[in-house]
Amino acid sequence: MGSIKRVRNILAAAACLALPAAARAQYETPVNPPDPAAQLAEMVALYDSVCLRAFPNDEAAARDMTARGAVPMSDAEVRSLLRDDPGRGWNVAGRTARFRVTIEGPPFHACGVRTMAAAAFPDMAPYRALAARFEAGGAYRSFGPQSMVVDNVDSTAAGERRDDRGRTESLMVFLGTPVAKLRDAAHSAVEIRFVHQIYAPH
């Protein structure tokens, strides 16, 4: 039971600290959505570089963003995503879509990449292959899917986690869309978010 409770706490923290308010404009259904496979491939490559290779070295992640010509988020943008927790973020104008990258400070030290899409990616094999390579030999255990509602966003999360010398390291995928009462044909986009989180309690 203790392990299950820890997973729920980790998921709740990631959702509450990273999901934006359910602004209708954010979830407008794309008129000309990009090819899902191409968008996923670009997102996976960005996540691999920033969140799996550079992170948890925050300065290395920042250098990666600078090299890509990413635009730093304003304080207001960062607060809308991370609430009162310390962190920073960047907007990335990708080839297929806009991506947002955030680095959240401890104790829930996390690197996240998110994008909006017309629907959840139909084939997550490229992400699964990347996660499997990263997790190889690390005694990761799967959890989820688990659902929650935060700020009128219906969110589903799943991933893998491991306990390592008093800290918990997780790879997670979140899908968020407006709750049913706010969702209609013009506002049905899905936020897709990949998160690498390292939780080290004080």
Predicted features and spans:
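Bacterial N-terminal signal peptides
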Residues: A12-A18
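Bacterial N-terminal signal peptides that target proteins for export
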Residues: G2-L11
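Glycine-rich, aromatic-bearing surface loops/beta-hairpins
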Residues: D151-H202
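N-terminal signal peptide c-region/cleavage motif recognized by signal peptidases
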Residues: P20-A22
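Long, charged/polar, surface-exposed segments that mediate recognition or autoinhibition
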Residues: V92-A158
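N-terminal leader/targeting segments
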Residues: Q26-E104
